[in-house]
Amino acid sequence: SEENKGMNFMSNFWFSTETEKKTSYFQLIFHIDNVKYRYGFEINENEVYNEWLYVTRHRETPVFIREGQNVNVTRSHMETGYDIANMKSKLFNEKVLFLSVADSFSDKLASRIVGEIKQFSKVNSKISLEEKKTTFLKDKLLKDKIIKLLKYADVGIEDIDQIVLGDEKIDATSSFLIGVHRKYDKNLNEIGTSVTLFDSMESEGTKEMLGISLPIITALELGTPIVIDEFGAKLHPLLTRKILSLFNSKENTRSQLIVATHTTELMDPRLLRRDQIDFVEKDKYGRSYLYTLVEIKGIRSEKYEQDYLEGKYGAVPFLGNWDNLCDIINDIENEED
């Protein structure tokens, strides 16, 4: 249903009897107009147990605190929210976040915070490419920016367009992205252009770069955060460093890039500070722990990548004896025979 669709993403940790029924805890700490906010909630698949919003100007004070269906609101911070809380379950139930209800009734602070949270986007390059292709193809200025970024990335693309194919029998059309490349004769003289179907003819790296180009440009222009999973998996290491440098430059004061990556070359003190490098370590019970490099005591070396691969920071896989793997496979095949 519409009211609890936001809980559909919930999935408990199923590898432990202690956590399979336990609530999950989420919290965001962020700034709006140089004012610090802390918003969070505890939920399971069916119910909101706790929810809170704090603001810090001179000191941290509560905007609202929710326990079950009981909500205490500071009226001076959230006037419409205060009225909603007094009406209790007539306007919201245990499956709905109080902040979203206050937003739907146009509470000024709630709407501002929800608007900021909605700017926080997780980038799936393939989905982004399909969903946004009409947007950037119709916007010449935006398209020019994307083409410029692709040229800087040295992927060989001169232009991007689309072809539209119609089917009169079913009254439908399909559109396909195409890439425009320079074409040369045997003497390497430019003689025109050649086109490629993006989905089937371009490399995975080129498709990845196009897919993340629009979110990157949007984030840098609007000062919003983005999250990219498996960052660098399909891109050249020099290119991933350049992208990271864009967000880590002095010119960028608002936007934030958060990535999950196995590209250890990015663990470079010339590129990232220790407090900007986090690790996720999974133990033998399947539990994952997040910690930052700055929390690890006694680090004097700046060879972050080398030290990490040597296991000095943890968060490396426990690999078996691969030297004997071929023998083990052969033994299994012999047993099958």
Regions found by a protein language model. Give the residues of each.
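Conserved P-loop NTP-binding catalytic core
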Residues: S1-R38, N44-V48
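Conserved ABC ATPase signature
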Residues: K169-I217, E221, P225, F231-L235
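Electropositive, glycine-dotted interaction segments
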Residues: K36-D167
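C-terminal lobe/lid and adjacent interdomain/linker elements of RecA-like ASCE P-loop ATPase modules
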Residues: K242-D337
